[in-house]
Regions:
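Accessory alpha/beta interaction modules
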Residues: 1-206
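Non-catalytic, well-ordered alpha-helical scaffold segments
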Residues: 58, 72-75, 134, 164-167, ...
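Short hinge/gating elements
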Residues: 57-65, 155, 216-220, 244-248, ...
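An acidic, glycine-/histidine-flanked metal-binding catalytic module
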Residues: 203, 207-256, 268
């Protein structure tokens, strides 16, 4: 008999229990009936273990992986990604200069300072941006400049450029752009600047792009390695299929505690419904923003095409005018003969 999440987590309630509580509580029922049928089903699936929650979505991430409350968990993720032990000194205010079009695609965006004073920005994109390199470079430069201003203000006359530390931009992508799919077996791409001579100059900015959809495709083929900490975390962050959740807690038992916390939260229907509602509001607004951005991109592309066609027509008209002038000149010459 196939095991379910309820077999591992006895605190998971049945669908009937959750629905009964909702219909017996006026405030809960009011919120519940404000959702679409699809959203109601998703909420019940979360509460009853039929589907795992999306850990990387902002509200759920804060529930389980908040760097303020559980710094050791995000430290473990960053250590696995950066291939070195890290400690989080503090969570920095995210004074992001992102334009609204960029924010519409983000479901998580946090900035932390590590023990060596380097900065790590962790973001999750629902859909991979166009021009990911250019966008990430601009945001990384913004973080670097903010660090420079903060350190210079703090150190004053004792400031040295050696006080400026690395800025890591770590991007998780749920649905990768087509360029990433040219590498179907590679889901982590690391980038940093270097000279063409081998001269070692630390230019401070490093980028790591992690394609979660490509990771899951590879996971289907090779399974979860017992000895790979990074793969274990990526599985936890990306999968919502109970089958893979069960495989994860079998190969890496430490994740059972995290899932237990999730299902303990699910038992408080009022609190979990509040988290779910906030996430729906953010996703709905982000979807609207994204659709507007897409429409604007389409309009801009059409305008470019129309301008190009108008230019071609003008050039063709000019050529016709020149031909007409030439014909008129030849006709005049023939008439004079």
């Amino acid at each position: 008999m196939t095991k379910t999440l309820k077999d591992h987590f006895s605190i998971i309630r049945s669908r009937e229990e959750v629905i009964t509580e909702i219909y017996n509580t006026a405030d809960l029922l009011y919120v519940y009936e404000g959702w679409t049928e699809e959203q109601q089903t998703l909420f019940l699936d979360y509460c009853t273990g039929m589907r795992g929650i999306k850990i990387l979505y902002d509200q759920f991430f804060k529930l389980i992986l908040s760097p303020e409350q559980y710094p050791e968990r995000l430290e473990s993720i960053l250590s696995a990604i950066l291939n070195e032990p890290v400690k989080i000194l503090q969570v920095l205010p995210n004074e992001s200069t992102r334009i609204a079009a960029e924010k519409s695609l983000l479901v998580l965006d946090i900035v932390v300072e590590l023990n060596d004073r380097s900065i790590a920005n962790v973001e999750v994109q629902r859909i991979g941006y166009a021009f990911p390199g250019q966008r990430s470079a601009c945001y990384s430069a913004d973080l670097l400049m903010r660090q420079y201003k903060r350190v210079k203000k703090s150190k004053r006359k004792n400031f040295r450029y050696s006080d400026i530390k690395k800025v890591y931009t770590i991007v998780f992508i749920e649905k990768s752009a087509s360029d990433f799919h040219k590498f179907p077996h590679t889901y982590i791409h690391r980038s940093k600047q270097q000279t063409d001579t081998g001269l070692q100059i630390d230019l401070l900015q490093e980028y790591i792009f992690i394609s979660l959809d490509i990771f899951k495709n590879n996971l289907q083929n090779k399974g979860i390695s017992k000895d790979n900490e990074l793969e274990a975390w990526l599985t936890f962050l990306s999968v919502d299929d109970p089958k893979w959740i069960l495989k994860l807690i079998e190969t890496h038992p430490k994740f059972k505690k995290l899932y237990l916390e999730i299902y303990e939260a699910c038992r408080n229907t009022e609190v979990f419904m509040g988290l779910f509602s906030k996430e729906l509001l953010e996703l709905d607004q982000n979807t609207v923003d994204f659709m507007i951005d897409e429409m604007q991109d389409t309009i801009d592309a059409q305008k470019v095409e129309i301008d190009s066609q108008a230019k071609q027509i003008a050039e063709q008209q000019l050529q016709l005018n020149e031909k007409d002038a030439l014909i008129a000149q030849l006709q005049k010459q023939l008439a004079e003969k």
